[in-house]
Amino acid sequence: MARIAGVDIPRDKRVVISLTYIFGIGRTTAQQVLKEAGVSEDTRVRDLTEEELGKIRDIIDKLKVEGDLRREVSLNIKRLIEIGSYRGIRHRRGLPVRGQNSKNNARTRKGPRRTVANKKK
């Protein structure tokens, strides 16, 4: 396995797919990186030369990926919570942040149902 940005990327997959294993790189960014490096998208990782891998590493080093990106996202959420914005409050309560309905759905964000016991009559 080749190692790029601290991530082992699979050798048997196409390069454009393998790069998406890195947090912060999706299909579009992977295609842009390969175009800039002059590498075909259809090439398998095992067929890349050290020179091509070096070019790809250099380009990805300029991008914000993995730990740096995760840290930035968590700091952004922390900032929203600290300033007391609506989005920050939704994050704190564990509810959907982007205006989705939360009366019936939103189970992923709210977690499993907590049933409330009925009072005895």
UniProtKB/Swiss-Prot annotation:
Locate the region Disordered. 93-121
Gene Ontology cellular-component terms for this entry are:
cytosol; small ribosomal subunit
Q: Does the keyword Ribosomal protein apply?
A: yes
Which GO molecular function annotation, any one, does this entry have? rRNA binding
Domain of life (superkingdom): Bacteria
| One GO biological process term | translation
Compositional bias, Basic residues, is annotated for: 106-121
Pfam families noted in UniProt = Ribosomal_S13
Keywords on record? Ribonucleoprotein, Ribosomal protein, RNA-binding, rRNA-binding, tRNA-binding
**Is Transport a UniProt keyword of this protein?**
no
Q: How does it assemble?
A: Part of the 30S ribosomal subunit. Forms a loose heterodimer with protein S19. Forms two bridges to the 50S subunit in the 70S ribosome.
Member of which family? Belongs to the universal ribosomal protein uS13 family.
Chain's role = Located at the top of the head of the 30S subunit, it contacts several helices of the 16S rRNA. In the 70S ribosome it contacts the 23S rRNA (bridge B1a) and protein L5 of the 50S subunit (bridge B1b), connecting the 2 subunits; these bridges are implicated in subunit movement. Contacts the tRNAs in the A and P-sites.
Entry protein name? Small ribosomal subunit protein uS13
Originating species: Bacillus subtilis (strain 168)
Lineage, opening ranks: Bacteria, Bacillati, Bacillota, Bacilli, Bacillales
